[in-house]
Amino acid sequence: MHCPFCSATDTKVIDSRLVADGHQVRRRRECLLCHERFTTFEGAELVMPRVVKQDGSRQPFDEDKLRGGMLRAVEKRPVSMDEIEQALSKIKSTLRATGEREVTSKMIGNLMMDHLVNLDKVAYIRFASVYRAFEDVSEFGEAIAKLQNDKSKSGKS
């Protein structure tokens, strides 16, 4: 691995440990020439299906877009980064598990809502309001009423 400070090709690994539930390896490295230390992360590159948008166009899966949508929904809510990363990981695993080369943006949106409803109800309503393009206050009321009905049916208080 090249040193990011002096571009030397000789570096040594000082420490390695598993992170992200064992899906990544974090390595502390030291350059043998300039003695600067830096961190690298190593993970398997998994092929994600392409996304078919509502207008029929196709584009590569964009994890940053998925993460951005979730972060906007949970902004200023009591949801930890670990919970967010776990939800994103589960969504990606579900998409890969379909075995399909292409998935619809609608499927991704529904998976996002399924995870948000379990993480934080307010974040779920925020995301649903944009995803389902709520036009007026009554649609918010309907979504909230549905959440409350689902809560009472599941026996939670």
From Swiss-Prot:
Zn finger spans (unnamed): 3-34
Keyword ATP-binding found: yes
Cofactor(s) demanded: Zn(2+)
Statement: the UniProt record of this protein carries the keyword Repressor: yes
GO molecular function, one term: zinc ion binding
All copies of domain ATP-cone, residue ranges: 49-139
Cofactor: record remark: Binds 1 zinc ion.
Keywords from the UniProt entry: ATP-binding, DNA-binding, Metal-binding, Nucleotide-binding, Repressor, Transcription, Transcription regulation, Zinc, Zinc-finger
Leader sequence segment: none
GO BP terms: negative regulation of DNA-templated transcription
InterPro entries, A to Z: ATP-cone_dom, NrdR-like_N, RNR_NrdR-like
Role noted for this protein: Negatively regulates transcription of bacterial ribonucleotide reductase nrd genes and operons by binding to NrdR-boxes.
HAMAP family noted in UniProt: NrdR
Family, as annotated: Belongs to the NrdR family.
The protein's name: Transcriptional repressor NrdR
Biological source species: Shewanella loihica (strain ATCC BAA-1088 / PV-4)
